[in-house]
A protein has these predicted regions:
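Structured interface patches
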Residues: 1-179
Length: 179
């Protein structure tokens, strides 16, 4: 798996300093086999030293591929996202003793050396902008629940009016009410 690492030693040593980075990645692990990069990931990052912490802001651009939630056909989703984080050196966490440990970790990305791995930040930024349910098209008809045929490619011969045996008694009740 490719990691996105930045050398921040120059920035850490001089308050008020600023540095820009550009990285490109061809693959990324999304913790979930449902998503893969379909296009090279381009990341532009600017980090500035702001006293007790570093400010990081950036932009990413890529496309990811996954499966349609209804018909399971492969779908490519373009992704553009801005992101921002405040970075806090692990040894400086004690300076924020007035905050609970959970609050510090919520507010800051904690790092512990001059090589900053932003892979998790980028991965989370991509996943945050992806739709909950990906469709190949808005009117996707999905798969036949009986035979599994992709209904976007034509109708199947299955009788979908067959009542689930567990609901048969309700169907009979409905029929008697209609009479």
């Amino acid at each position: 798996m490719t990691t996105l690492e930045l050398d921040i030693s120059k920035i850490r040593s001089v308050k008020g300093s600023r540095e820009s980075f550009h990285r490109e990645v061809d693959d990324m692990d999304f913790w979930d086999a449902d998503w893969q990069l379909a296009k090279q990931l381009a990341v532009d990052v600017e980090i500035s030293h702001e006293g007790k912490f570093l400010n990081m802001k950036g932009h990413l651009s890529t496309a990811v591929k996954g499966n349609c939630s209804r018909c399971l056909m492969q779908v490519t989703v373009p992704v553009e996202s801005d992101f921002a984080e405040q970075l806090l050196y692990a040894k400086d966490v004690s300076l924020f003793s007035h905050l609970a440990v959970g609050e510090v970790e919520e507010k800051y990305f904690i790092y512990d050396n001059d090589t900053l791995d932003i892979t998790d930040i980028i991965r989370e930024s991509i996943l945050a902008v992806l739709p909950q349910k990906v469709l190949c098209r808005d009117d996707c008809r999905g798969l036949c629940p009986k035979c599994g045929k992709n209904l976007n490619q034509g109708q199947c011969d299955c009788d979908l009016h067959e009542v689930d045996p567990r609901l048969a008694i309700l169907a009979k009740l409905k029929e008697t009410e209609e009479v």
